[in-house]
Every structure is written in C-alpha cells, then in structure tokens.
Design a protein with these regions (language model features):
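Extracytoplasmic/periplasmic terminal helices and flexible tails
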Residues: 1-138
Length: 138
C-alpha cells in the first residue's frame, strides 16, 4: 500500500528504514525525490497490505531517527527514544486518532506531512481498527 510523505528536508531517512505503528514494523521507506518545485522532499513508503487499514486521512507521521532530550529545571531530564532499531537506523512512525478525527481510509499514493517530532497527544490515540489478512495467513 504505497504512500508519500512530504518533508522540508530528508534528514536521516533512507530506503529500507522501518515504518512503525505502536513500535511494530508495518512497512518501510522505499525511496525519495525532490518535489516538482524542489521545495519539499517526497519520501515514498510502502505499508504492508495487512496493515493498510491503519492509515486514515487523520493519521500523523513523524521521524523516529535518533533520540530527544527534554531538560527542565523542575522536572529533571526526560529522554525520548523509539525502538532500538529506529534509534540506530532512523525511520518513520505514525499514529491514527479515534472517532471523527480518524477520517476516511487513506487512498494508495496519498500524501501526508512528515513531522520532525510527534505531539504528545498522538501517543494517547488508540483506535480499534480491524486489520486485513496477509496472503500468508490464508
């Protein structure tokens, strides 16, 4: 199930990087190119067919490369990392909201913005979405 992610810069993303949903690999980056007017990078990803139902018009994608550190005088330091694989390799993660925010199922080839980092609320999204069957499950 092909999708396109649009970003200002490529960053550390490269073909073969994982695309994850809830830290489970559901696809991978297949390539990239400059957009038609060279002001964006278009990153091609392929979601495994059985996981295509996870992607809706309200889904949000973000980079998982590296780790983030947030330091506050009163809170101490908090470190944000994704899976060890994405920490080393980089990659893309996404989340899909509940209810009306979810929107319709994405269409093949649909374009989504790729955010540099996630918003905290995205981690709280937990819609129940029926998954498709992979050909190997039959």
């Amino acid at each position: 199930f092909p999708l396109v992610l649009s970003a200002a810069r490529l960053g550390s993303i490269k073909p073969g990087n994982a695309v994850t949903y809830r830290e489970v690999k559901v696809g991978e980056v297949t390539g990239y190119e400059l957009g038609q007017t060279a002001d964006r990078v278009l990153i091609r990803v392929l979601i495994e067919p059985r996981y295509a139902a996870l992607v809706h018009t309200g889904s949000r994608f973000w980079e998982t490369s590296g780790f983030g550190v947030d330091f506050s005088l009163f809170k101490g330091a908090s470190v944000r990392t994704d899976s060890l694989e994405s920490l080393i390799e980089g990659g893309v993660a996404f989340a899909t909201p509940d209810g009306e925010q979810m929107g319709r199922r994405a269409l093949p080839g649909q374009t989504f913005a790729l955010f540099k980092e996630p918003q905290e609320e995205w981690f709280g999204w937990a819609p129940k979405i029926e998954l498709g069957r992979a050909a190997s499950d039959k």
